[in-house]
Amino acid sequence: MNSALQGIKVIDFSQWLPGQYCGMVLADFGADVIKVEGVKGDPNRNFAPQLAPGMSSWNLALNRNKKGITVNIKTEEGQEILKKLLRRADVFLEGFRPGYLQSKGLGYEEVVKINPRLIYCSITGFGQESKYKQQPAHDLNIIGLSGMNFLNDTGNVAISEVQVSAIGSSLNAVAAISMALLAREKTGKGQYIDVSLYNTALSMQIVSLASISGCRITGDTPFGRRAHYYDVYKTKDGKYISVGTIEPKFWRMFCEMIELPELKNRQYDFVHEEEITQMIRDELLTKTRDEWISLAENGAFCVTPVYNPEEALENDMTKESGMLETRREDLGEVTYLKPAVKLSDTPCNIRFRGPYAGEHNRKVLGALGYSDEEIVSFKEKGII
């Protein structure tokens, strides 16, 4: 099978979701990815659920298609191992706090001297130049700092189960790496990529913040707040439906469906919004979710069910999407969620599960020229 990134060598030295998801996408589309961890393995190896000792579902999914090695870069020997890998690599992916790898002789300025064609991508909370660059932060912190928590409601803070800034940063990194690889074809040189979760969270709010036009609209755009025509409503059985009737024609169809034709011409009546919203709430409580969806012609005018994760995975829309792939692994039957994009000639390909920590130490280090005796010695000394 042809792969879009076949022949591209990636060293993934990230510990958390933003870098690992980026490396996963690159690997799924054919890149040869080596996952580097500390000698104790990444922290997520201990997350629940555990499929086997040292193998969490997180690791199995995010590190699929990657070879795994462990290296202690606090030692000179470990630093030299990583440098040997980087001499042969096309892409280096890391997520340490700014300055840490520089302190180990592995910063961009040092590494580019041994491999000018290397694309060096850093994914951090606040970027390399921010005065907050040393501040630790996870997705929950980032979406709070960026104002994203408040966008879906009027006063109540919303917490998403989806790591929005982390996944967004991953995809930004994939795009940036792809552009840098294309640019390298013209210039012959690699470059440095600085990806920030905070900047990603801000950029994802372009419609809601509307700051590029000079008018700071916070909460008054159709997508930046709840309106009676753009909201989630509870139904008789305690379930919910999404009403996304932004287009006037869809709004009119919705009003007919709920038998409130008097609201057809009041789509933008925000003066009486609370009253209109309550009318809709009362009416939607008279039927179950599935009864309303049947009347809504299964989404014909942007009225759709709100599913829980189990329902989302089991519904026909997901099954026919091609997003799920079930494979028989040594740990048992595993269902993987594939990348969202589909390439007609060079599709993604899930080839093997995520590795145990250091599973490919001997194979990878042997390819670098280290003897079996040296590899055993490295293990005994805590270098790998």
Label every model-predicted segment.
Residues N2-G41:
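Conserved small-residue-rich beta-alpha loop and adjacent elements
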Residues D28-G68:
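Glycine-rich phosphate-binding loop and adjoining beta1-alpha1-beta2 segment
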